[in-house]
UniProtKB/Swiss-Prot annotation:
Biological process according to GO: GPI anchor biosynthetic process
Family: Belongs to the glycosyltransferase 22 family. PIGZ subfamily.
GO MF, one annotated term: alpha-1,2-mannosyltransferase activity
Protein name from the UniProt record: GPI mannosyltransferase 4
Function as written in the Swiss-Prot or TrEMBL entry: Alpha-1,2-mannosyltransferase involved in glycosylphosphatidylinositol-anchor biosynthesis. Transfers a fourth mannose to trimannosyl-GPIs during GPI precursor assembly. The presence of a fourth mannose in GPI is essential in fungi.
Membrane topology reported for the UniProt record: Multi-pass membrane protein
Pathway: Glycolipid biosynthesis; glycosylphosphatidylinositol-anchor biosynthesis
Gene source species: Gibberella zeae (strain ATCC MYA-4620 / CBS 123657 / FGSC 9075 / NRRL 31084 / PH-1) (Wheat head blight fungus)
Top-tier EC class: transferase
Any one Gene Ontology cellular component term annotated for this protein: endoplasmic reticulum membrane
Subcellular location: Endoplasmic reticulum membrane
Transmembrane segments: 59-79, 86-106, 175-195, 209-229, 274-294, 343-363
Keyword Electron transport: no
Amino acid sequence: MWRRTYLTLVLIRLWFALSPSYLHPDENFQGPEVIAGQIFSYPVRHTWEFTSENPIRSVFPLWPVYGLPMLLLRWLWIGNGQDGEIPPIAVFWTLRVLMFAISFVLEDWALHELIPSPKHRRVAVLLVASSYVTWTYQTHTFSNSVETLVVAWSLVLIQRVADPRQRSCVLSATVLGIVAVFGVFNRITFPAFLVVPGLRLLPVFWKRPTSLVCLTLAAAVTTVIAIGLDTAFYLPDSVTWTDLIHRPVITPLNNFKYNSATENLAQHGLHPWYQHLVGNLPLLLGPAAALLVIRPKLSIRLWSAMSGLVVLSAFQHQEARFLLPTVPLFLSSIRMPRNQTVFYIFTAVWIGFNLALGSLMGIYHQGGVVPGQVFLSQQPDATQAIWWKTYTPPIWLLNGKNEFLTTRDVMGLKGELLLEQLSQLATCDTPADRRNQEYLKEKNGTYLIAPASATWLDPYLSNKGLEGLRFREVWRYRKHLNLDDLDFGDDGVWDTLARVIGRRGLVAWRVTKSCPK
């Protein structure tokens, strides 16, 4: 029975992986967009993390996670005799399937190794597989999703090295050194999860110093390779050994310095120290958070998650996705209720919670952004695109169209200023604009992409006269919710929810204006 349930949950995970929700711009701009610009001819946008004087993001972990699959896909594309570049949307879906696969294989495999009891293992695997976090965040291209897998496998390797039944732990120690450096260059928060589990290695290193030597050498070589790749990426000239010695680019160090300054974190939002504990963790775990408090199961997994939670709470910028590595660790460290009635109640609440959050985050959350970019890439007349009240769209999905199309992200712009921009950029209205599809033959076109719930636009959309701006709806995607437009203060709770949910969707309008003859 549990195997059929698990298989069903795996298929649900795949279904969510193939849904175009957009959880945060970082899932694109801190990974796929960077590497896509290196492998393909897609014009891309590098964010401040990669363009500042002291860059804080490493490309070292991006190459094995995203670069190798892209190179393989490119090789297969050329090998099949296809002309031109691979459509970016094909690369996008390939990466989603890849994230599903490594989550399904590596995350679940790690749980099998970390949990000795078959009964408890089945419960833990089913809890993790039925979590909306696994369905959504873990199937998206976040560095946090990669960190989840690296933390889990670091615990597996620590367990193997510390196992007294192992005749030799040289291989496990060597791999642990490589994985640990990979984890640090992926996210500097990674060591926080190994503070307590790492203590298990001290007696092992005392008894078997060879394992310490192997771990140190592997970590040192991997560090040199990582710094070399980053230095080659960020320095404009060809890298020499002199550059690596005298002006290396050490991104984890830059990242730590940046995040240690409160004035830097203030640009992204400051939170109280307890935000992770009372806000983000219950949001990720749902009703399982109560069981974690009432019936925890002490294990190395629990201590790893707790140490990560404590260290991350010391930083003032706290987002829920920063705690992704703790989710499988916490879910595998709880005991199910013994009372049958309580068990059934928990199961019902758990299923309802994950179905609700899974649908919200996995289907509707900014769900029209990716399809919207694909739509714009197919519009021959599009030269200006203004995105209002949405997340920043992935530029590389335009398939080279952005050589001619200027994308403007004006998410928080006031409505009056938006109209000013549209008035400046809108093309002149012609009879062709009023006939079906004739406008596509024009050389220039201005498009506004905004949520259907943006009621501020309503008075202007119905203009059919000769004066002012004209908005012609040319595309609509229904499965889109804009949670950043919840104005409870002005509209009240129920009116706001009715507007955002009732008028869900993302719309593209072609904007023109009356011009003097």
